[in-house]
Amino acid sequence: MNRGQWLASYIGNNKAVGVELGVLRGPTFKALIKICPNLTLTGIDVFTPDRYWQANKITTTEELLKIQPLSWFDELLEFCREYPYRAHIRRDFTNKAHANFEDGSLDFVFIDADHSMEAVDEDIRLWEPKVKKGGLVSGHDIDMLSVKMAVMNHNPQYEEGPDNVWYWKKE
């Protein structure tokens, strides 16, 4: 079972609102939209090679949007047009995009963006408040030391799922 299938089994046919941080080419994003008919999902990614925006010290959304996105960004936008009320892509930094979501408004967040310890730590800190009580705080790549350290800083009792998924239910 891969991470998309695992998350889809959690969501099922329930009405749910979620965010995926770090979409890349969109395999998990697309799978969730196709499998979960009552899911509204927003995918957030810079859609620019990290080395480019980091080397050029780009830190604002305005600066980011001036850069030509990677080719698969347009493919994901086209996919979203097939599901106009349920599938949304936002080109932004994860530490900026959180401001567009109300606290307690999400059923889940799936964190799979920048895998540095500092970035994962920041994503959890900024996005966990957006998840409803009883919702899922989750992500990918728990097999990476940087991810594991950040996750353990927030919840030492986290659980693991297939395909290197980590998660906990928000209390």
Question: What are these language model-derived features?
Answer:
Residues 3-171:
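S-adenosylmethionine/decaboxylated-SAM
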